[in-house]
């Protein structure tokens, strides 16, 4: 899976501490492992996505199990035709509540997926590595 530069749409390549495109546009990888590809100047926003309060409220809600039947049903549909070395992209992964579950279940099935989670909330992405070892961007 590859990512595209939000400035020029060329392919980004991961280097040690940055993602860079052939035109030289660079995006720093944060100490916590994520990279922000949003163009704040063009959107007028300084912050994107859920804040810490929203993240904590969602975590509290999800911990009560209300969405576990939904998560299981989505996994059943996902795994029915998932290729052995397939790629799973969770767009809007948040803290990776679904992502970590899908990854562990696919791993248990011997499917060896490449799993990526993307989100616009830096606060969610800061928590994601604690939930599972997914690539973050």
Predicted region positions:
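N-terminal auxiliary segments of SAM/dcSAM-dependent transferases
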Residues: 1-47
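Short helix-loop-beta connector
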Residues: 80-87
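Generic structural signal for well-ordered alpha-helical scaffold segments
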Residues: 75-79, 103
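Secondary-structure transition/hinge residues
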Residues: 66, 82, 107-110
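Class I SAM-dependent methyltransferase SAM/SAH-binding core
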Residues: 87-89, 95-137
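Class I SAM-dependent methyltransferase Rossmann-like catalytic core
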Residues: 51-70, 77
């Amino acid at each position: 899976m590859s990512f595209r530069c939000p400035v020029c749409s060329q392919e980004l390549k991961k280097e040690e501490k940055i993602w860079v495109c052939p035109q030289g546009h660079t995006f720093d990888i944060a100490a916590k492992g994520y990279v922000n590809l949003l163009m704040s100047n063009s959107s007028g926003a300084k912050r994107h996505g859920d804040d810490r309060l929203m993240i904590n409220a969602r975590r509290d809600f999800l911990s009560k199990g209300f969405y576990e039947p939904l998560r299981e049903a989505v996994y059943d549909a996902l795994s029915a035709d998932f290729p052995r070395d397939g790629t799973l992209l969770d767009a809007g992964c948040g803290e990776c509540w679904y992502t970590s579950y899908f990854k562990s279940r696919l791993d248990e099935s011997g499917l060896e997926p490449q799993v990526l989670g993307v989100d616009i909330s830096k606060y969610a992405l800061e928590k994601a590595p604690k939930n599972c070892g997914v690539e973050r961007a």
